[in-house]
Curated annotation (Swiss-Prot):
It is an enzyme of class 6 (ligase). This is 7-cyano-7-deazaguanine synthase. PANTHER family: 7-CYANO-7-DEAZAGUANINE SYNTHASE. Zn(2+) binds at C190, C205, C208, C211. Binds 1 zinc ion per subunit. Its EC number is 6.3.4.20. The keyword Ligase applies. One of its GO terms (biological process) is queuosine biosynthetic process. Pathway: Purine metabolism; 7-cyano-7-deazaguanine biosynthesis. It comes from Helicobacter pylori (strain P12). Catalyzes the ATP-dependent conversion of 7-carboxy-7-deazaguanine (CDG) to 7-cyano-7-deazaguanine (preQ(0)). Its cofactor is Zn(2+).
Length: 228
């Protein structure tokens, strides 16, 4: 793998930052790609840019601001949907879910990988702590990998090394990679865009579903460390 190129879907969050460091140790070249899809807070993109610079990795942003016009999610900047409720289009999903977001991201990453000659795409998705998003599950990833390769006569691999790791295990992975401090202080997870309050697990409001999941994971990580 050391001679191969890997394209990473990069949001500047805990998952994709840990993934980027993992990939940097394994591939000759790593390219980070972020998406501006009219999410509520630009802080996500700002953190991604800073982390990319700290990791000395190339970073590009693809604009997808049209998504807000064709579907609904509490993550959109103009949305009035209240966080923590069911999705307006599907009561079985959280309203932070953006329908087909990962399918669109992966399709564009696949095109980009073909352009630069990359044989690998890496995603920070996990079905252990997946927030109720069906497009983070392994069966979806395998299906879209097969479909895109079939439709473009390619054999690009979609790697998901975090697929079966929970947040506590991801904190441990960051520690093992030597970037725990970076993950805590520089990555962004909070749905509310809060960057004024630094908790033990990182910046955030401490109340939104993303903060709660990250907080729980960090507490489990710390508890396990006490017995090692």
């Amino acid at each position: 793998m050391e001679q191969e190129i890997c394209v990473i879907s990069f949001s500047g969050g805990q998952d994709s930052t840990t993934l980027a460091v993992w990939a940097k140790k394994r591939f000759k070249k790593v390219c980070l790609v972020g998406f501006d899809y009219a999410q509520k807070h630009s802080v996500e993109l700002e953190c991604a840019q800073k982390i990319a610079s700290l990791l000395q990795l190339p970073y590009e942003i693809i604009s997808l601001d049209f998504l807000e016009n064709i579907t609904r999610s509490a993550l959109f900047k103009n949305s009035n949907d209240l966080m923590g409720h069911s999705h307006a289009q599907n009561k079985d999903l959280p309203n932070s879910f953006v329908p087909n977001r990962n399918a669109i991201f992966i399709t564009l990453l696949h095109s980009y990988a073909q352009k630069i000659g990359a044989s690998n795409i890496a995603l920070g998705v996990s079905q252990a702590d997946f927030s109720g998003y069906p497009d983070c599950k392994e069966d979806f990833i395998k299906s879209i990998e097969h479909a895109l390769n079939l439709g473009s006569n390619t054999a690009i691999k979609i790697l998901t090394p975090l697929m079966f790791l929970n947040k506590a295990q991801e904190f441990q992975m960051a520690k093992d990679l030597g970037v725990l401090d970076l993950v805590i202080k520089e990555t962004h997870t909070c749905y509310q865009g809060e960057r004024r309050i630094l908790h033990a697990y990182g910046y955030g409001c401490g109340e939104c579903p993303a903060c709660q999941l990250r907080k729980k994971g960090y507490e489990e990580f710390q508890a396990k460390a006490l017995f090692q």
